């Protein structure tokens, strides 16, 4: 039985095992780390993590990303089985929101990846902001390659800083990648290419693979170089490489309101597969 109030503390290294054990053993878990494993994210200090205690028992945790342009993601959330999730979520969120306000963070967002999240976050004042849709491609039949002045080549480690800079210009908050996310995305990508003009990177793509299924994780073009078919060239090259690797299916996520992105993918044979994820937001006063 939970007490009237939980004790909220800041995560420290000594709590690592308890947090990971709760993550593995509970059904009340949300994880949105993209390219990172939970332990890796914790060890890298890539955000702030708060813990909820009932005496010496860990009842829950919440992990928020480092802010970008005043926005922070809820990357981790876990509640111990057998507790009252609503109470734990409420107290963790109250503490997280207070810390965010102190740090000048204006918005907290979360992807509704599991069906138990919406009810509790609605109570906390979060609301549906937009949808992240999934598009799939089967068969890998390609239109002719576009003619572009940009050169497409494999990305190298020295390109990562330029890729991160392009990403921040190409996307609005909260969709921009932090530098550490870009570095990890590059390390784990099956395919990473950049488009250059006069030896300067102006666009990039990152793709991953799991067995015979590929995923276009990121595609971004510097705003000054849009409408030059560079995105089409990067996509065509990625699809050609995927076909060479005998991938049977590809997927990509994009925002429901990003019609330009959707039209590009549709031209190359992608279609919406119905797997949409809601993004919820709370503005911190």
Where are these regions (language model features)?
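Acyl-donor-binding surface of acyltransferase catalytic domains
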Residues: 1, 68-70, 80-148, 278-282
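Short amphipathic alpha-helix that is part of the acyltransferase structural core
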Residues: 1-34, 132, 145-174
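Conserved donor-binding loop and adjoining core beta-sheet/short helix segment
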Residues: 24, 36-94, 98, 197, ...
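Conserved acetyl-CoA-binding loop-helix of GNAT-fold acetyltransferases
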Residues: 85-98, 221, 227-240, 244, ...
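Conserved hydrophobic beta-strand within the GNAT/NAT acetyltransferase core sheet
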Residues: 108-111, 216, 250-254
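Conserved active-site alpha-helix within GNAT-family acetyltransferase domains
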Residues: 113-130, 228, 232, 256-274
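C-terminal "cap" of GNAT-fold acetyltransferases
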Residues: 133-156, 248, 253-259, 267-285
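Phosphate-binding active sites in nucleotide-utilizing proteins
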Residues: 175, 186-197, 201-210
